[in-house]
A protein has these predicted regions:
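Catalytic cores of nucleotide-sugar-dependent glycosyltransferases that transfer UDP/GDP/TDP-activated
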Residues: 1-196
């Protein structure tokens, strides 16, 4: 897992939430899971501590490159213990996959239209996972499998009948298209705006 947030995350941390769900379900199904994550993570199975505490809440996330590189080093050091490595550490996924003989599934949760990725996927290893078709389209030269993020069934129930309100709960960033959605929503009759 990325060293930025605990697994599961305390507040923000979509990638870490997905890692937590995967670890819990694999453990429930009887798999032996080793998770490389921050020391404040609370997960079943073996836990290898990559940093004492998650970097973002500790105010140490300005340049986390060294922590990601240390995570890669730690995984490579123990790689022969694993049948499969499922990596969620963004651009460092590629380095990890290239440097081990163990099969690696590399899930990318973030944007891929960024400078580091411009040529990174030209000769990318196999096992690349994008979380949306749109994300995969950014680098068509790579061989992607698209697996959308899922939700657990223990979330609050969905409203059984439609209403006239819409609620977005999440981190607002430009790539999520919130401003576009607001502009479209303004044309809808009877739509009320509220903010928390």
């Amino acid at each position: 897992a990325p060293p930025l947030e605990a697994v599961p995350p305390i507040a923000y941390g979509g990638t870490e939430r997905i890692v937590s769900e995967l670890v819990h379900e694999l453990d429930r199904r009887g798999h032996h899971v080793t998770t490389f994550a921050s020391g404040d993570s609370r997960i079943p199975g073996r836990h290898v501590v990559t940093v004492p505490e998650a970097l973002r809440p500790a105010g140490l996330a300005d340049d986390p490159s060294a922590a990601f590189e240390e995570t890669v080093r730690m995984v490579l050091e123990r790689a022969d213990e694993f049948d499969l490595i499922h990596s969620h550490i963004e651009r460092w996924n590629l380095e990890l996959a290239r440097r081990t003989g163990v099969p690696v599934v590399s899930t990318f949760h973030g944007r891929l239209d960024v400078p580091w990725a411009a040529h990174a996927f030209a000769e990318a290893p196999r096992g690349l996972v994008a979380v949306s078709e749109d994300q995969a389209r950014v680098h068509p030269e790579a061989s992607w499998t698209v697996i959308h993020h899922g939700l657990t069934f223990d979330l609050p129930p969905m409203v059984g009948h439609p209403g006239d309100a819409f609620c977005f709960i999440g981190r607002i960033t430009p790539e999520k298209g919130i401003l576009d959605a607001v502009e479209v929503a303004r044309t809808a009759p009877r739509l009320r705006f509220s903010r928390a």
